Amino acid sequence: MSIVQFLKDDLSTARANGCEAKIFFTHHPLFLERADEGDGYFVIPRVRRKVILDILHEHDVSSVFAGHWHRNNHAEDGKLQMVVTGAVGYPLGDDPSGLRVVKVRGDGVTHKYYAMDDLPDSIAL
């Protein structure tokens, strides 16, 4: 089974089961600024990106979370958020090493980046 078919099947199952919050995690970001931006080392190639984005939009996926760029970044394509999280060990931008906590609740998806030096003792989930 291809990744594309897996994604279609999984999101169809989520829809059939009444899943309200749908998110997608991937190593490489789909895009950094715009869904129609050019190809590059840090993003999924456009020809593959379009196929994936069409599926995600068709199934009302709200957020895509990725890494690979070693910087924090946020962009949108319609209602879809593209959230890139910086590295824990070797950040390339101005953001310090850290991690992102993603919370999925009935009313939606929230996320927050924590620098390693600023991690709280506990995080309410």
Where are these regions (language model features)?
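His/acidic metal-ligating clusters that form di-metal
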Residues: 1-82
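Binuclear metal-dependent phosphoesterase catalytic core
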Residues: 72-125
